[in-house]
Amino acid sequence: MTSRLLVFTRTTGYRHDSIPAAVTAVRALSRHPVEHTEDPAALEADLDDCAAVVFLSTSGEVLTPAGRDRLAAYVDGGGGFVGVHAATCTEYDWPYYGDLLGARFDRHPAFQPGRVLLEDGDHPATRHLPEVWEFTDEWYDFRTNPRDTARVLLRADETSYEGGGMGADHPLAWCRAQGEGRVFYTSLGHAAEAYGEPAFREHLRGGLAWAAR
């Protein structure tokens, strides 16, 4: 059976205008056929043929109880999961999901330029990046620091922008194990323009490839 990448973009909270550009980018970057949906029933179906499930700027409560059970079983059993940007603004009422991603969104300052610091360059999502990467985005703060349960790949230099709230240890992208599965998350990707930026595209490509089984 051909593996597919299931890209889910349902929103019941804030909706990012960048979602169409993000989906187009993932189609181009994935080595697997991409199925894009906003139908929660797609997460209730058999996911065993998925190379990975991608929550691409989802927001709010987006899954049914059956979908929650199916996704948890899939990842714990060895499936891949990728969260992009607002994926951490999703499923606040489901404790497992917070554990899955490693952190939950708290707040962000204004969209503005800043510096991304390379913490771990030995990963497909970061091998191409310089030690300091100039980027423009929403610099997400998280309710908790994911470092205790995740391998941090990138962090923010809060001295390079206004309004940061996490201090010197401010993870922006990380990966982790969940059961037998692999999870990759990047908080970057607010604006449509990001998905045409070569360094960000390679960051996303590497994360997708690493998480996919």
Task: Show the residue positions of the predicted features.
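Oxidoreductase and adenylate-handling cofactor-binding alpha/beta cores
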Residues: 97-103, 135, 140-150, 189, ...
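Extracellular ligand-binding/catalytic regions of CAZymes and related secreted enzymes
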Residues: 9, 20, 25-29, 161, ...
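A structural signal for well-ordered alpha-helical segments within the folded catalytic domains
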Residues: 20, 24, 69, 92-95, ...
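Helical hinge/lid and interdomain linker segments adjacent to catalytic or ligand-binding clefts
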Residues: 6-10, 14-91
